[in-house]
Amino acid sequence: MSEVRTGFLTMTTIILISIGLTMMGTGLYQKTTMSSCIRETSSQFTLLGLLLLLIPQIGLYGICCRSKRLFNFFFYGMVVLIIIVSYYSIKCSIYNTTFGIAKNPAKDNRTVPQLLGRLVSKEKFEKVTYCIIHKHDCNYNASKNSNVWKYCCAQPVGCGTITMFDKPGEWSWKHQYERNQVPEECSYEYCLDCRGCQLSILKAIVHQWKYLSMFAYPALVLSCISLAIAWSLKETIHENEDYRGSYS
């Protein structure tokens, strides 16, 4: 029976390691390729991936080496991991259920002041907006899961072919073209003050938590299963000392 439980524990730890590796790889990749203002992942995402990568590995070593000490480190490490993953899972659930913004932010009946301060601080919102303004960070990858491109960076209706920078048909923020003389309603600051734009920025910030929940929920379930199996095996793990002896 203990062999079966050991097999299940090995499988769950391998899956947890795979989730952690995926999270770390995704976080590091997006850090180099995605917008520095709005990302799907954050430092918390990468940190959680690192914990999921390291702690289950201790369990694998403990099982393979029949090491009581390593297995105890794994057991208490999983307790800490479950507490951390539970915290993020609860936070993800709160964001996803109470902070949903319409797919088309411009049609959301709520105003930005109504939403600021509850789950997204005013400082966080202003920091992201400030980042967009000063880095002109409106490339497609900056907002592939939000409408920031559509509601903040696209040319406003009625502005014709006049653009913020001298490149017909689009606004380019990655290259500093010679600035055109544009009407006030076509200015970048004007667009960032639009409700649809502001709500789309909020939606992009909250999307980080929706993306994290895709990994946090299954990681929490598997961590609880691993801990339960580890508890049942805790007293059966003993170091194999058969190889230790003396030669005559």
Curated annotation (Swiss-Prot):
Main localization, broad class: membrane
GO BP term, pick one: auxin-activated signaling pathway
Membrane-spanning parts: 8-28, 45-65, 70-90, 211-231
GO cellular component labels: membrane
Topology versus the membrane: Multi-pass membrane protein
Cytoplasmic topological intervals: 1-7, 66-69, 232-248
InterPro entries assigned: TET_plant, Tetraspanin/Peripherin
Highest rank taxon of the organism: Eukaryota
Residues carrying a glycan: N96, N109, N141
Keywords: Glycoprotein, Membrane, Transmembrane, Transmembrane helix
Residue ranges, Extracellular side: 29-44, 91-210
Record's subcellular location: Membrane
Family: Belongs to the tetraspanin (TM4SF) family.
Stated role: May be involved in the regulation of cell differentiation.
Protein name (record): Tetraspanin-17
